[in-house]
Each structure stands twice: as structure tokens, then as C-alpha cells.
């Protein structure tokens, strides 16, 4: 079992219940899922680009992503309905906790010129969204085997009712927010 999951069950639940005055442990916010999304607009011209993106995402997430396709044709972007334009993966359970651990302990400290995560990226309902500019911050990616530096979106969905609860939950997991 992941260390962060043990920490959540042993200390975080009690801390948050005390801080927000919850009467039941089921009221305490928890992380529901983590969604990774990689938009690969260049895949319209070359199908191999999508294969590389899927390979990278599989290595990072530990499970195979779903290829997302264009819903509408847009002449300005030279895409047609049904063209593959990205990939996404939703992590839950054990894989989610393991990914969160790697994100906080290994990947985030490897971001170039890192000055802390923005605390403004909460959506009003306690969910946190962040962008990563380079997939090479993850140790699973072999720098010599990548064809192009790609970024991705990481969304952490929680059961928190508001941003304050969501921030307290992520703070308990040592997320490095800007002061």
C-alpha cells in the first residue's frame, strides 16, 4: 500500500476532522481520482506522434490511456471529426496513491525554475488542476527515447466542498504551494 494512503488514514483524517469540526470520518475530504490529459494536436499530421504520446503516458500513469478524438471538424486547425488529438487516463485506488506519491516526492521537485504551485488553481469545489510543461520530470520517462517534449494536465478531484478544504487536504500531503 502507498505511504501517502497510510498517512491519510492514520493522521490526515484526524487532523482535518479536528480542523473543520467534522463529526464523522466520512465527512473528511478525500482524493477521488487523478486525471492526466495530454493534448497532441500535431498527431493530425503524423500518426506516430500519437503512439509516442500514448507510450509516455502509459509509462507515467502505469495504465494504458484512452485516445481522445475530435468531436467537431475545425478547418482552422486542419482537423476533422474523429481524428485522434490527445490521450487521457483516470487513476483511482492504489495506482492513484502511487502516482500522487511520485508526483509530490519526485516529479514536482524536478520541475525547472520551480517556485511553488499556484494556490489559485482550485476550481471552487476543492478540485485542483495543474499543468506540467515537460513529461521528462517523471523518472519513468527515458530522456533518450522521447521524440519531443510534451506537457500534460493533471487534475486532482477531491470530495471537498470548497477550496479551503481542498487546499487543507493537499497541504496535508506536502504539496508545495506558493506562500
From Swiss-Prot:
UniProt superkingdom: Bacteria
Glycoprotein listed as a keyword: no
Record-linked InterPro entries: Ribosomal_uL5, Ribosomal_uL5_bac-type, Ribosomal_uL5_C, Ribosomal_uL5_CS, Ribosomal_uL5_dom_sf, Ribosomal_uL5_N
A GO MF label: structural constituent of ribosome
A GO-annotated cellular component: ribonucleoprotein complex
Keyword annotations: Ribonucleoprotein, Ribosomal protein, RNA-binding, rRNA-binding, tRNA-binding
Gene3D superfamilies assigned to the protein according to its UniProt record, in alphabetical order: 3.30.1440.10
The protein's name in its UniProt record: Large ribosomal subunit protein uL5
Family statement drawn from the similarity comment of this UniProt entry: Belongs to the universal ribosomal protein uL5 family.
Gene source species: Shewanella baltica (strain OS155 / ATCC BAA-1091)
GN (gene name): rplE
A single GO BP: translation
Subunit structure: Part of the 50S ribosomal subunit; part of the 5S rRNA/L5/L18/L25 subcomplex. Contacts the 5S rRNA and the P site tRNA. Forms a bridge to the 30S subunit in the 70S ribosome.
HAMAP family cross-referenced by the UniProt entry: Ribosomal_uL5_B
Role of this protein: This is one of the proteins that bind and probably mediate the attachment of the 5S RNA into the large ribosomal subunit, where it forms part of the central protuberance. In the 70S ribosome it contacts protein S13 of the 30S subunit (bridge B1b), connecting the 2 subunits; this bridge is implicated in subunit movement. Contacts the P site tRNA; the 5S rRNA and some of its associated proteins might help stabilize positioning of ribosome-bound tRNAs.
Amino acid at each position: 500500500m502507498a505511504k501517502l494512503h497510510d498517512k491519510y488514514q492514520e493522521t490526515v483524517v484526524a487532523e482535518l476532522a479536528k480542523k473543520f469540526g467534522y463529526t464523522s470520518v466520512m465527512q473528511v475530504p478525500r482524493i477521488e481520482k487523478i486525471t492526466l490529459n495530454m493534448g497532441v494536436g500535431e498527431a493530425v499530421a503524423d500518426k506516430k506522434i500519437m503512439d509516442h504520446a500514448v507510450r509516455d503516458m502509459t509509462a507515467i500513469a502505469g495504465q494504458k490511456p484512452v485516445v481522445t478524438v475530435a468531436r467537431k471538424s475545425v478547418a482552422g486547425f486542419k482537423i476533422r471529426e474523429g481524428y485522434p488529438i490527445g490521450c487521457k487516463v483516470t487513476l483511482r485506488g492504489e495506482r492513484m496513491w502511487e502516482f500522487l506519491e511520485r508526483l509530490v516526492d519526485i516529479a514536482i521537485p524536478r520541475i525547472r525554475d520551480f517556485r511553488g504551485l499556484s494556490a489559485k488553481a482550485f476550481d471552487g469545489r476543492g478540485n485542483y488542476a495543474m499543468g506540467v510543461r515537460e513529461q521528462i520530470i517523471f523518472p519513468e520517462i527515458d530522456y533518450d527515447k522521447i521524440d519531443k517534449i510534451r506537457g500534460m494536465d493533471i487534475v486532482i478531484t477531491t470530495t471537498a466542498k470548497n477550496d479551503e478544504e481542498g487546499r487543507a487536504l493537499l497541504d496535508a500531503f506536502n504539496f508545495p504551494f506558493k506562500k
